[in-house]
Amino acid sequence: MGEPKIVVVDYHKGNLSSVVRGLARAGAVACTSDDPEQIRRADGLVIPGVGAFYDAIAFMRESGEADAVLDAVAAGTPLLGICLGLQLFFERGDEGVPADEGADADDDASEQAGGPWVDGLGIMRGSCTRLESSRLKVPHVGWDQVHMTPAGAADPLLAGFAEGANMYFTHSYAVADDADTADVLARTHYTRSFPCIVRHGNVWGCQFHPEKSSALGQRILKNFVSIVEGAG
């Protein structure tokens, strides 16, 4: 494979140029697209971190992007989610859900307060809920430490990553306690401990923004490009 073609999935919620530039610096041919067929044909995919859970998943379903992403994942295409992109991998979220459109969570849902819920892509088990604190400011904005699990320390996405490194976060919602621990590569603590890097098969996600996290963030993007090259 030459330079891998990575499509940044455009669900019409923000400027994606910083992600495209970061992937290009990492050695990929990167572009944005909302075309389901272009998404299916990509060597690798990135779902970026802009907007609210409900609005993003609603657009992805209506446009055919959601089915295209799931088809690509089933075919073995590497996928990276950033911030909201990570959250969309999970079974459900409650950000921005109109009260008359959401559903009650089932018995397996998070014990934390939340809902009404909207279904996510369902690639990983668990929920995404709001960070709550009477002492700390929400949203969580700024640099914070990332602590790897043993699985994370051995994962190719984190090759060369320093334990306890500071990465740049900006979010009000995070993965809840009902996530499968086998999918968690790293955690961060802000108002509560939450997974900040996850993996399930050929799907990875970062709650922080690697494209805004200096040299270590760029290393993660470069590692993802290498993963895409290896899958080709």
Give names to the regions the model predicted.
Residues 46-48:
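Structural motif
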Residues 74, 105-109, 116, 125-232:
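Amide-donor transfer/coupling interface in amidating biosynthetic enzymes
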Residues 38-39, 72:
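Structural alpha-helical scaffold elements that stabilize or flank donor/cofactor-binding regions
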Residues 51-143:
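Cysteine-nucleophile active-site neighborhood
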